[in-house]
Amino acid sequence: SVVNGDPDPQNTGIQLKLGQATTMLPNGSFGGELGGYFTSRDTISATQNELGQLSLAFADAMNTQNKLGMTLNNELGKDLFLLPSSSGMAYSSNTGTASITANVSSGDAKNLTPNNFEVTYTATGVDISILDGNTKTSVYNNAVASYPATIDLANYGLTLDLSAGANPGDKFLIQPTHNAALTISTATSRPEDLALASPLQLTSDSNNYSNATIKLDNITDTSSFSGSTLLASAPHKIVINDSGGYDIYDGSSPTAVLLGTATAGSNIMSNASFTNPTYDPGFDLSISGKVTPGDVFFISFNNNGFSDNTNGLALAGLQTSDMVRKGNSLAVDNKMTFNEAFSSTLTSVGTKVSSYKTSTAAADAKLKQSQELHESVAGVNLDEEASNLIRYQQAYAASAKVITAARDTFDALLSAVR
């Protein structure tokens, strides 16, 4: 009989029952039309996971980059998409009442894989395994002090919210990407919410002696901003000192505070020695050209930056950036572009369809051969039967003539006796 899967009811299977004993038949043990249905189901499910992974990676990348720009309303950008969460499916053998919710970590969807996860409660904590076909690999096994608890799987772009009420041995299936392509939605429909401009404006003092220019390299976070302003504690200007160094000052008034100094004009913030060694303004910039002591360069919020499409170009550039994870490996270069990910999914499906078509053609040829072999032994040859009928007809006609001749002879004898 057909039974619902455990814990995923859509993952149906075939159960064999003999008396009081029951057992589940492995999906791979079926052939023919039934086996084709199961193979199609498994192939579609895997492809659905990959499309979900691609959808989440794209949406999160757009959200992250949009929040690094400025809108037409002189505001920092916000999310363009709403990333769906997924609820853990409890196994039927669970005895507790706990629940699990998986959420995509903002900015980390590029670390998502198309795989499902299994969470098992232990006596002291939880064990989390990643599922790859019939292979299960533990990726997290730690104690949990108390529940509810949140577990950060940064390497896989997820956070898991665990409620109280679980018993040791309880298990949950997590499918973070399975329905993502279907349930993902937009957070806004207003074109004005596209943050196409940079929130920073960089200018050179008109009294500078040199022709050196300043340009923005990148923005990685908006910790230096508050609403439509650049925080006073953030870098506001760079002054070339007498040694040719790049002194970085904040926006304190009336006296600016020296935050740090860089010795070269390339990636000034990354290479600067700040008074606070852990300080990171969340952006980087460079000054090109030969500078002169006393030159000043200003950093400010980009009010009314209507002719600035810096962040718009960054949004467009995401299509050629490596934003989708290739597999379960934690290697640094294990990423691909959105186009590559989509092409990979199409290629995978196309290869499987071609393989199944070949298998079907081979099975049809084998069936035809078997039918011909059977008919050659037990079947009827119409030509042979027609030949036999003609022969039987001729024999019948000959027999009829013999009978006729015998009857005539017998009649003649009777006439002679009379």
Locate predicted features.
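S/T-rich, low-complexity, solvent-exposed segments of bacterial secretion/appendage proteins
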Residues: 1-418
